[in-house]
From Swiss-Prot:
The lineage of its organism: Eukaryota, Metazoa, Chordata, Craniata, Vertebrata. InterPro entries: ZNF750, ZNF750_Znf. The gene is znf750. It comes from the Eukaryota. This is Zinc finger protein 750. GO terms for molecular function: DNA-binding transcription activator activity, RNA polymerase II-specific; promoter-specific chromatin binding; RNA polymerase II cis-regulatory region sequence-specific DNA binding; zinc ion binding. Zn(2+) binds at residues 27, 30, 43, 49. Residues 66-87, 366-433, 592-671 are annotated as: Disordered. The keyword Chaperone does not apply. The keyword RNA-binding does not apply.
Length: 671
């Protein structure tokens, strides 16, 4: 019981094995054994037994000897147990040392049967050890801080033997060396599993204390010489020194000259050696490298000459972007990321159409501010929303027109040229500039629109004899695109008078002939009707549904007299084709700008009702199913007969009507 009390000051993870129990695990750093592995690993983790490692080997060899005297056992066991608890307790009492002696005796008894073979050797060594270890060394070892010995001992896993020459353990060195040499067989049978390392391993492993001395160079040269020469020369040297290692005759090979890049030429061995420059020092230092390579330079030199230079131009060129102006401007990131000699052929083909679009975008940048300055605040907001460029629908961006909308380019023209000439119908100069802008950007569409331009030009000249004759006549291809469906108050007043004067009776006659509901004065500004018709004629020849209407309009345009050409054409185009054009315009305008954009078609209805109110009443009963509510709502707006009021009422109802008209008008076109 007193022994247990004496053990109390030790840390709980450091409790040694109780004396009477057989041990399962033995700490490889200290003489303690325990039944729980965690205690032993805590020894490793916290470095609790740093000073006892050398003593553990002695204890395995000496203390566990059955034939040693009790005094002989006490003294060597006193040494390890005096040293081992140093990290835990710096001051050890005599009682604790006695308890440690008893623990050592128990271990010696348990290991008795293992040591019968090693009796004579171990007895000799124990006697010498007892003589050579005075108690002063034990006391000094107790007071010694563990960190000093830990610095000397690089690792707990290195077996301690003849190479432990430093510290206060210098006294024990001859005995330890004799122990490790003489009873080698007995040592390995007695030692624990952690120390059962063969002596060849200990002798072969060079300790870190002597790492800076001649032991390491001794092993390096044999290792290099043991390698087969071709293996060493082929893998190690040519990768680094191949340009210098060839004879001059082989370096003048055509193979090297073919693959050598201008960056490599200074490294070719022939100019260096011919000019008297010394060869690189890494080759001069180990002399065996030349000896190894001289043996095998007949066969592998082709491989050195062939493969190494091919790598250099690949990296030198692969990391540089070839100085193609188009690549350096825009696609430097792409060309750097991609292998430069595989892709650059495909880059120009991708870039040239983009450059064409960039030219168009630059032209638009030059020309689009001219109408934008003339537009009011609402048209400015629309100019942000819509893209005034030919070839792109309102849903596409000016840089990248959406390819799905190429079949609806006429719709795109509607919304776009809405923008370019929206509020410019009252001023001829404005329309002229916008016509120029459109002509520049719509050369791709002129072939389609040119054949329809005479009809529209005649209509424009007759309806706008004072305003547009000088503008529309010189620009045949531009005239259909000059159309503004956004009516100003002045234009409305002009065409209210015109429609009231001559179009009322004629329009009634034509309404009887043809489909009533869209018998609207789409020609708010005289161009709006043509805008729908022009864009429709660009669109509908591609669509089978309304192509006969298209031809019918041409014939009527040609045979109608000049004075009534505007209004008769406005009524004739109110057939199914006009329904299609209204659907087209509403689809285009509703997608491009939600607030104002349905002007072209809703102004048709509203202005039809304001200009010719007597036409509204025959129109409502004859309205088609798709336009019933539009007619009903249109009758509500017939009360405002003044052009200014009609415009304000249109603005009020546009946001409401555009969505419903969009849905109503879209259905027959989709079906």
């Amino acid at each position: 019981m007193s022994l247990v009390k004496e053990r109390k000051p030790k840390k709980p993870h450091y409790i040694p094995r109780p004396p009477g129990k057989p041990f399962k695990y033995k700490c490889f750093q200290c003489p303690f054994t325990c039944n729980e592995k965690s205690h032993l690993f805590n020894h490793m983790k916290y470095g609790l037994c740093k000073n006892s490692i050398t003593v553990v080997t002695d204890q395995d060899r000496i203390v566990k000897n059955p034939k040693v005297n009790s005094t002989d056992q006490k003294q060597p066991s006193n040494e390890p147990f005096a040293k081992s608890p140093v990290p835990a307790i710096n001051g050890l009492t005599g009682l604790e040392s006695k308890t440690q002696h008893s623990v050592a005796r128990e271990e010696a008894k348990e290991n008795f049967d293992l040591k019968n073979e090693a009796k004579p050797h171990v007895e000799k060594t124990t006697v010498t050890k007892e003589v050579t270890l005075p108690p002063t060394a034990i006391i000094g070892q107790i007071n010694k801080p563990p960190s000093l010995d830990g610095v000397m001992r690089p690792s707990a896993f290195i077996p301690v033997g003849e190479h432990r020459l430093k510290g206060t353990e210098n006294i024990k060195i001859p005995e330890l060396s004799s122990v490790s040499t003489e009873p080698a067989k007995g040592v390995h049978s007695i030692k624990s599993a952690f120390h059962s390392l063969p002596t060849p391993w200990k002798s072969g492993l060079v300790s870190p204390d002597f790492s800076h001395k001649s032991s390491i160079p001794r092993y390096i040269r044999p290792m290099i010489s043991e390698y087969p020469p071709q293996f060493y020369s082929e893998t190690g040297l040519p990768a680094v020194f191949s340009p210098y290692l060839f004879p001059q005759a082989e370096c003048e090979n055509p193979m090297l000259s073919v693959y050598s890049a201008p960056e490599q030429r200074p490294f070719l061995p022939h100019p260096l050696q011919a000019s008297g420059l010394p060869l690189p020092k890494p080759i001069n230092a180990p002399f065996e490298h030349y000896r190894l390579l001289q043996q095998f330079q007949q066969n592998p030199q082709l491989h050195y000459g062939f493969y190494r230079p091919t790598e250099h131009p690949y990296f030198s060129y692969g990391l540089k972007v070839p100085p193609v102006p188009s690549l350096s401007k825009e696609h430097t990131s792409q060309s750097v990321d991609s292998p430069t000699f595989i892709y650059p052929s495909s880059h120009p083909s991708r870039l040239y159409p983009l450059e064409g679009f960039q030219k168009l975008a630059e032209i638009q940048k030059e020309t689009s501010p001219v109408p934008a300055k003339n537009l009011d605040s609402k048209s400015d907001s629309e100019s942000v929303k819509m893209s005034p460029r030919a070839g792109s629908a309102a849903t596409g961006s000016p840089g990248r027109p959406s390819p799905t909308n190429f079949t609806q380019n006429s719709q795109g023209h509607e919304g776009i040229f809405d923008l370019s000439t929206k509020s410019t119908s009252d001023k001829a100069g404005k329309d002229f500039t916008s016509g120029k802008a459109v002509r520049k950007s719509t050369d791709c569409q002129t072939t389609i629109s040119r054949e329809h331009s005479p009809c529209f030009r005649n209509d424009e000249i007759q309806s706008h004899s004072d305003c547009y004759s000088d503008d529309a006549a010189p620009h045949d291809s531009v005239a259909p695109l000059n159309l503004s469906k956004r009516p100003e108050v002045e234009d409305r007043a002009v065409f209210d008078t015109m429609h009231n004067s001559d179009s009322n009776d004629e329009s009634v006659g034509f309404m009887e002939i043809q489909d009533l509901p869209l018998n609207l004065s789409v020609k708010d500004s005289g161009n709006n009707q043509k805008a729908l018709c022009a864009d429709e004629r660009l669109l509908l020849p591609r669509q089978v549904t309304s192509s006969p209407n298209y031809h019918f309009i041409h014939t009527v345009d040609k045979r109608v007299p000049a004075t009534t050409g505007v209004h008769s054409l406005g009524i004739i185009e109110n057939c199914d084709e006009q329904k299609q054009s209204a659907a087209v315009a509403l689809c285009q305008l509703a997608t491009s700008s939600p607030g104002v954009p349905a002007r072209g078609t809703e102004d048709e209805f509203s202005e039809k009702e304001t200009v010719a109110p007597e036409q509204v009443h025959p129109r409502a009963p004859a309205a088609q199913e798709t336009e019933a509510d539009i007619g009903a709502r249109g009758q509500k707006r017939t009360n405002s007969k003044e052009p200014g009021k009609s415009q304000s009422s249109n603005k009020k109802h546009k946001s409401v009507d555009s969505g419903r008209m969009f849905t109503l008008r879209k259905r027959p076109r989709v079906s």
